[in-house]
């Protein structure tokens, strides 16, 4: 498995603003909680970027990332009501 990395300053901001961290994401990736992985819909602006849809505490989060030969770099964590409804059947 490739190394997973992220920006520590972004992680601190996500913990404060969204009460979720990249450590949470990595835990759920390892637990097999990825519902789907898609190409970013705007490949012109975000070339090569993909998005994991991950369940964390019964809520779906979008996690954009860039994958290289050496690592997977996590960009941010976005809570998604729309994806939660689609994949889980209801909002929390």
For the regions a protein language model found, what residue spans apply to each?
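Ribonuclease/tRNase effector modules and their secretory precursors
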Residues: 1-92
